């Protein structure tokens, strides 16, 4: 029987005035734009993780009731599976800025029709699938 490794992540599609929030990674981390979010720790549920990550990475405060699951991505490689849950929100509080400066150097709002070229491949894939109305995709 195979010994599959599975990881669970949660990411945020945060809207404000018709645009979505993206964080730009520092050069050592790729220099690309990505969504807020990360690993769901063993003591957390996905929305709790996203609330924590959003505050750590972008200085924003979210409430569980404002997070709606809109997409599930299943990624796999030779040795592992990764499930990523994407939540949408329109409400938030706080002082928005890239806070984990060793990982991110900017927080910016982008129109879904004018996304930056240097968006991570995974995030680009998910946003295309999400806009098509697809709740689930594989990569």
PLM regions: where:
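A short coil-to-beta-strand element that immediately follows conserved catalytic motifs
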Residues: 61-71
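NUDIX/MutT-family hydrolases
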Residues: 98-131
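Conserved beta-strand segments that form the floor/walls of ligand-binding pockets within enzyme
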Residues: 34, 68, 86
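A short beta-turn/loop motif at secondary-structure boundaries
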Residues: 27, 75-79, 101-102
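Conserved Nudix-box catalytic region and its N-terminal flanking loop in Nudix hydrolases
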Residues: 16-56
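Active-site-adjacent beta-strand/loop module that shapes the phosphate/pyrophosphate-binding cleft
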Residues: 8, 16, 73-96, 108, ...
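Acidic/histidine-enriched, glycine/proline-rich intrinsically disordered or flexible terminal extensions
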Residues: 132-139
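Conserved N-terminal beta-strand and adjoining loop/helix that marks the start
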Residues: 1-21, 70-72
């Amino acid at each position: 029987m195979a010994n599959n490794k599975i990881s669970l992540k949660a990411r945020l599609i945060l809207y404000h005035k018709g645009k979505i929030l993206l964080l730009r990674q520092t050069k050592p981390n790729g220099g690309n734009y990505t969504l807020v979010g990360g690993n769901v720790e063993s003591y957390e549920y996905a929305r709790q993780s996203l609330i924590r990550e959003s505050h750590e990475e972008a200085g924003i405060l979210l409430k569980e009731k404002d997070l709606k699951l809109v997409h599930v991505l299943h990624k796999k490689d030779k040795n592992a599976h990764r499930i990523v849950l994407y939540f949408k929100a329109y409400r938030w509080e706080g002082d928005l800025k890239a806070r984990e400066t060793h990982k991110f150097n900017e927080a910016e709002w982008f129109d879904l029709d004018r996304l930056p070229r240097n968006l991570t491949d995974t995030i680009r894939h998910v946003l295309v699938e999400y806009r098509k109305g697809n709740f689930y995709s594989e990569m």
